[in-house]
Amino acid sequence: MALGRTGAGAAVRARLALGLALASILSGPPAAACPTKCTCSAASVDCHGLGLRAVPRGIPRNAERLDLDRNNITRITKMDFAGLKNLRVLHLEDNQVSIIERGAFQDLKQLERLRLNKNKLQVLPELLFQSTPKLTRLDLSENQIQGIPRKAFRGVTGVKNLQLDNNHISCIEDGAFRALRDLEILTLNNNNISRILVTSFNHMPKIRTLRLHSNHLYCDCHLAWLSDWLRQRRTIGQFTLCMAPVHLRGFSVADVQKKEYVCPGPHSEAPACNANSLSCPSACSCSNNIVDCRGKGLTEIPANLPEGIVEIRLEQNSIKSIPAGAFTQYKKLKRIDISKNQISDIAPDAFQGLKSLTSLVLYGNKITEIPKGLFDGLVSLQLLLLNANKINCLRVNTFQDLQNLNLLSLYDNKLQTISKGLFVPLQSIQTLHLAQNPFVCDCHLKWLADYLQDNPIETSGARCSSPRRLANKRISQIKSKKFRCSGSEDYRNRFSSECFMDLVCPEKCRCEGTIVDCSNQKLARIPSHLPEYTTDLRLNDNDISVLEATGIFKKLPNLRKINLSNNRIKEVREGAFDGAAGVQELMLTGNQLETMHGRMFRGLSSLKTLMLRSNLISCVSNDTFAGLSSVRLLSLYDNRITTITPGAFTTLVSLSTINLLSNPFNCNCHMAWLGRWLRKRRIVSGNPRCQKPFFLKEIPIQDVAIQDFTCDGNEESSCQLSPRCPEQCTCVETVVRCSNRGLHALPKGMPKDVTELYLEGNHLTAVPKELSAFRQLTLIDLSNNSISMLTNHTFSNMSHLSTLILSYNRLRCIPVHAFNGLRSLRVLTLHGNDISSVPEGSFNDLTSLSHLALGTNPLHCDCSLRWLSEWVKAGYKEPGIARCSSPESMADRLLLTTPTHRFQCKGPVDINIVAKCNACLSSPCKNNGTCSQDPVEQYRCTCPYSYKGKDCTVPINTCVQNPCEHGGTCHLSENLRDGFSCSCPLGFEGQRCEINPDDCEDNDCENSATCVDGINNYACLCPPNYTGELCDEVIDYCVPEMNLCQHEAKCISLDKGFRCECVPGYSGKLCETNNDDCVAHKCRHGAQCVDEVNGYTCICPQGFSGLFCEHPPPMVLLQTSPCDQYECQNGAQCIVVQQEPTCRCPPGFAGPRCEKLITVNFVGKDSYVELASAKVRPQANISLQVATDKDNGILLYKGDNDPLALELYQGHVRLVYDSLSSPPTTVYSVETVNDGQFHSVELVMLNQTLNLVVDKGAPKSLGKLQKQPAVGSNSPLYLGGIPTSTGLSALRQGADRPLGGFHGCIHEVRINNELQDFKALPPQSLGVSPGCKSCTVCRHGLCRSVEKDSVVCECHPGWTGPLCDQEARDPCLGHSCRHGTCMATGDSYVCKCAEGYGGALCDQKNDSASACSAFKCHHGQCHISDRGEPYCLCQPGFSGHHCEQENPCMGEIVREAIRRQKDYASCATASKVPIMECRGGCGSQCCQPIRSKRRKYVFQCTDGSSFVEEVERHLECGCRACS
């Protein structure tokens, strides 16, 4: 498009965006979404070089090519490529992939090319490619693969190119390549191969390229076969050299003589190798079948361990779960140690099949429940350590297969009871540890006391925790009769054998039936133990801010409803609802959610109701509701949503109700799809409305025309991801620096995966609470701020934090639990603060601390700080810088070197030191003020009413502030709590005279009157027909003194008031109006009409007579006035002005003699006025005035190649210009013109621009157009409507086009300032009357002019009569049609006969067979018409009454634009192309093109692009043999 460089750019972008929106809507459902940051084109998805750490979600299912190369992906899981059944090419090269789960490629049935080179693969899992039968090229080069297992390539028989070079391969198992019968290229160079079995290449008949060079080939007798094999194939395997023995090193394998391939000693079989035995995880060490991974920071169980391992050590890592079958394949395992991790979830089959396992160590984790069957089959187990966990229940059959168990430790757990029979299978048990459990010693634990007395194997001293009478007593020493049950205890423990201990209601919650109500309890997180029977979980009105992925819902199989309304939820972590497959209703109303992602609702597969009302959501993206196919009701009411991404609701296939109200929708091009979706989907939506742009405000989205959803080119969708770095900071990978930025709070937009955060040199007064959400932090620098106090558990969530810098702040106090949870902290800097004391136990959790900086603090070294001195000396964690400041005897002594016995307490401690941790101890609040601690100001005083100031020391006169309301008088009173009292005026009461008592509580109002409260009184508001102070007096409006009816009207009393019946000639509520009967007078020859009651009189000019002055004078008198010979037209009156005749024109006419008709009234249904096109030039100015009270209609229409129209649309003026070379453009007036008053409308065409001006306001421009509008062509210009034969086919807009004509007045039409005369109206201008008098004759119909001064009425359905005032009678009632259907035609009807009958009443039977037998159709088929007459329906290419004439083969030229679809854009030729269509008959041949030529045409697309394509054009038609 050749457009201007300035303002036109925005217009072009708007048109292109609109075109794209139209194309996407018209083409059906929106295409699948593209993953974030990736680029999607047709069936290709490009995500290369984006720094991705995992395969992105949301890959389109129709993708055929996927580029994920040059990222940081480390693992390929089973779900990464699930469902991509059309994928043919997959690029994963140049990543960090070290693990590929088995089954990762199971859905890739069409995969042909796979690149995995330049990764970190060490092990190639067997059967990895068995589900990719069409794979032809596989690149595994430049990895760390150590061996090729026998089943590595099972199932990929079609592979032609396999690249394994530049790995660490030392073992190729026998038969590894057996399936590769079509292999042509195999690269094994640059590996560690020393031996190759003789059968390795036997099944490769098509091999043409083999690379074996740069290996460690040992040329002994076992490799002699390879020499013969290579000599027979000289073109492959070149440069394959021996590396051993020494005397053959460097020789070509093919050139060494067979006799030199010898083995020392007797010949034996080639030593076999095991590929799996070579694998060892990169972070671990492997030797003697023992894998040691201790303290390596692992977060999951390593995959691809050597198959023959007997022991694995995984203690002191960060593993959180043990997945299904984690150890199943390692059948020789004897010892597993996973102690001191973070394990909370164990799959039931994690240890399945380990029959050789003798030792299992799981202590020091977070296990709460042992899954059913976890230890089944472990028949050799002798040692099982489960101590230091959180186990609260054990099923009775937990240890059923552990007959050989010697030692079982359940020490330090949460067990309250143990089911009888739990230890029965333990036939070999020798030692049992049960201490440090909160045992409830009731009747259900009686068996344990008996068991321990009979089997003294419990050596840890297990004791009772409750009831109080048995508390702290050893279970083995209590007599069995002491174990008794109350009713509640019996209910609680009845089902403990099946782990139904959770029948106990969680603390702070209320349980009734299956409802667990934990609402309004100030909970910060979901309780960790909930009853398994829970169906309805109520957590509303709490303080929950983050929904963690704790797996809690996996333990609640019966859960159906979750209420989380009215919390503070800002984030829902991925996997938070895992296990909630049965939940049908989720309430998240009244929270602080700002963004949503598709993974936050994962697991809610059965959800039917989702309430997200009253949050802060600003955008709904197309993956937000992925997987929620069962949702029927979705509420997004009262959020901040401005845009919704196309396809956002596509996955909600069951949706029937959606509430989108009270959202600030911006109806730009990003929202175009929603209006169409709302119209197409018949669901309850609440009819959401636009709020922007201004001209669409409060208009329902589904009512907005598609072309009105526009963008100005600068707008972005609010669904775009916010920047991953705060605006005030700089970010490099996961390091964020916000130093010296003057910050008072933590900046927004902090990346969730931040590991190092620098906030030094700002104005922070406290440690930001938001830091607890960033759990990956390893370093925080908060130095040089103004932090004065820490709170307990400030850093408890930061388990990875290793460095914490708090130096040079204003810290005065360290709470005892301030550093709880910092078990990984190595460096703590508190240098340069105001700390005097550190409470004992403050550093209990700092088990990894190696450096403590406490220098430049005024330490008070008395006995309370002795512990710190000992602690520092024990590990030399403080470098000898911290010095004591007080007491005087310890001043300037080093904390590290001063002997411990010198830390003594002598006398009271200075109050200023003690008050550092509690400023209120110094009693700063005076005059009985209440002191409370403040983290910023140290303390805050709440003053009594008569004092103010920081310390409540400033007295105030309470009466000065006039606390008494409503004119009450204030009196000072020291005896009262507030220091004053009020004397209230009459009618008020209360301490401050703030209460106006309701005097209507006891009122005397009668006759259902309404009492209105006053001040110390009330008033009665009377119903109609009643009056009086108490509404007890009846009003008769029709008595003479009350009658308001005028002009002798009759007054009629009603229940509520009265009614006046007017005499003829008067109207109005009180008959006060004398009707103007002159409105439709018939006075002629300029007679004056004088209104009378119910009539009028014509005062005739001199010489005229008759009732209507219709009779002219009998003779022409001598001229006595200048008007005598001056003829005024159109009923105008001649008057003399300054001795000159002047015509006073009636409304609607102008000119010296009123000869021009300048105002017309459009009253008909299809009325219009046609103006000749010669009056319009290419550069023109068209102006007119309009008056109407209608919302829609056509004002002006010019139809040609580039049609334009001026229309009324919803009360505004709309200008539409449609050029085939670009999308239609539209502009609206700001002003509305449907108020019945005259408004000026002006259209200016100049220099390829179209401008609209309404009421002399600011012009609205369509901008620079591609070419000058072709308004100067020969097509006519229509006003007020268009002929029905023309229609609006030239315009390409949709169903919102106002096809109806204009109803109202058009006045003073000027074209290029030339006033147009409507007097010579063409014949078709019916329904157009001169002047601006509205037609009110037709009661139930439309007026249509038939002559200059008369109209006829076109009645609406159901009405008839000359004035459409008579209800129509159905003419088909009692019809006489015998064998047919009655069809109404106005006041009559006709009969539509059934087949085989004819006649006016369908009473004559036709013999169709005989009728057609005498009527021959040569090239067609005979049919019988409705009248019973035969006729011929001709075959193509024939015509005539009997189809006897063959049409000659001819070419017919049709001019139209050729269209193409390019991706998502619609493209068309820039101009119309002449196309020849061949039609006609050719006997036995066919009418076809016989001459054609190809020509290049430019196609312009709606996305702004263009291209050139050759198009074949037919030039001549003729008869040719049919093909």
Swiss-Prot record:
Residues 918-953, 955-994, 996-1032, 1034-1072, 1074-1110, 1119-1155, 1340-1365, 1368-1403, 1408-1444 form the EGF-like domain. Residues 1449-1523 form the CTCK domain. SMART domains: CT, EGF, EGF_CA, LamG, LRR_BAC, LRR_RI, LRR_SD22, LRR_TYP. It comes from the Eukaryota. Gene3D superfamilies: 2.60.120.200, Laminin, Ribonuclease Inhibitor. Residues 34-61, 271-307, 496-532, 716-752 form the LRRNT domain. Residues 1-33 form the signal peptide. Glycans are attached at N72, N192, N563, N622, N784, N792, N797, N928, N1025, N1181, N1247, N1406. InterPro entries: ConA-like_dom_sf (IPR013320), Cys-rich_flank_reg_C (IPR000483), Cys_knot_C (IPR006207), EGF-like_Ca-bd_dom (IPR001881), EGF-like_CS (IPR013032), EGF-like_dom (IPR000742), EGF-type_Asp/Asn_hydroxyl_site (IPR000152), EGF_Ca-bd_CS (IPR018097). GO terms for molecular function: calcium ion binding; Roundabout binding; signaling receptor binding. Residues 1158-1332 form the Laminin G-like domain. This is Slit homolog 3 protein. It comes from Mus musculus (Mouse). The gene is Slit3.
